[in-house]
Amino acid sequence: MSLIKSFWGCGDNQIIEFAIVRARLNHRERQAVELVLDECMTQEQAAEAMCVSTRRFQDYWYSATNKLMAIPWVMAYAKELNID
């Protein structure tokens, strides 16, 4: 999760929004990512907020993060940001 956190934490909302569009996240996938990364919720809290089981939430979460990390420039940018 650290690469997706690095990318999300870059602070450039236009790049993040463009990545979401390019990854073709559906509403629930986007909501899952936003609850964990923007609202700092645990997966359990986010699942409750979405009125789904933790297992279903994890399906949304992993689908969303896999789609985002499958975009080559997102992966490269996240790796660059992750270098300390």
Residue ranges and their predicted role:
Residues E34-M41:
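Short helix-capping/turn signature of helix-turn-helix
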Residues W73-D84:
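Short, basic, alpha-helical segments at the C-terminal edge of helix-turn-helix-like DNA-binding modules
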Residues M50-V74:
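DNA-recognition helix of helix-turn-helix
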Residues I20-V21, L37, E48:
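Residues marking the start of alpha-helices
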Residues M1-S6:
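General nucleic-acid-binding
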